[in-house]
């Protein structure tokens, strides 16, 4: 979001993530990396972990960084929407992840402006994560009034009206938030430190490989 970060990893990749840029890393069968903040007036960023399906857990690792100018921007009502992944209003984002179909939008609203999003599929979970300002849903009895708050929208219950859009209004100082949506995998998750697997046995095996120096394939 703001500030500069240097990246280096076990694949030999080196890159600089600039303000308003992003990186996309697929851990897959294993990758070691380090992120090094550089002197900046302000450092603010988000790290989102996307769980891979069990059948894709051991795909080859990969990395790319994306310059700010390579991220599509559209005006949506009064909102400025940066499309990192998925699509919005017919415009596709820079990231095309074939393993998980995720929509990832960076939305900025001016003071007191409203915004409506009705492109989520019926089988998706969706959440909004507030970065700056305050945000008030027009329907759900929730609000995000401080940085780091989230508003969650889950898969509809069968038989319920699924046509209701996500509709929010910014507070008097405006709002900047992330919108993320994807179908739930409905698979077990076992997490330990930097590793996410589907069973305790898989997790323990990964840590054994780390200790034995065989983690990187």
Task: Report each predicted region and the residues it spans.
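Jelly-roll (double-stranded beta-helix
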Residues: 1-217
């Amino acid at each position: 979001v703001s500030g500069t970060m240097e990246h280096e990893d076990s694949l030999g990749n080196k890159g600089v993530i600039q303000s308003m840029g992003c990186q996309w890393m697929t851990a897959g069968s294993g990758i070691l990396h380090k992120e090094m903040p550089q002197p900046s007036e302000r450092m603010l960023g988000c790290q989102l972990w996307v769980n891979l399906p069990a059948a894709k857990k051991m795909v080859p690792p990969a990395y790319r960084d994306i310059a700010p100018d390579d991220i599509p921007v559209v005006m949506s009502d009064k909102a400025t929407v940066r499309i990192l992944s998925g699509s919005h209003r017919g415009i596709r984002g820079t990231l095309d992840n074939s393993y998980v179909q995720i929509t990832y939008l960076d939305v900025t609203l001016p003071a007191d402006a409203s915004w409506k999003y009705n492109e989520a599929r019926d089988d998706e979970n969706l959440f909004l994560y507030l970065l700056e300002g305050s945000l008030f849903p027009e329907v759900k009895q929730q609000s995000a009034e401080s940085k780091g708050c989230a508003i969650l929208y889950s898969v509809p219950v069968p038989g319920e009206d699924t046509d209701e859009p996500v509709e929010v209004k910014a507070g008097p100082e405006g709002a900047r938030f992330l919108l993320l949506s994807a179908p739930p995998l409905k698979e077990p998750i076992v997490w330990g430190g930097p590793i996410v697997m589907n069973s305790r046995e898989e997790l323990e095996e990964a840590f054994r490989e780390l200790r034995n120096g065989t983690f990187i394939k």
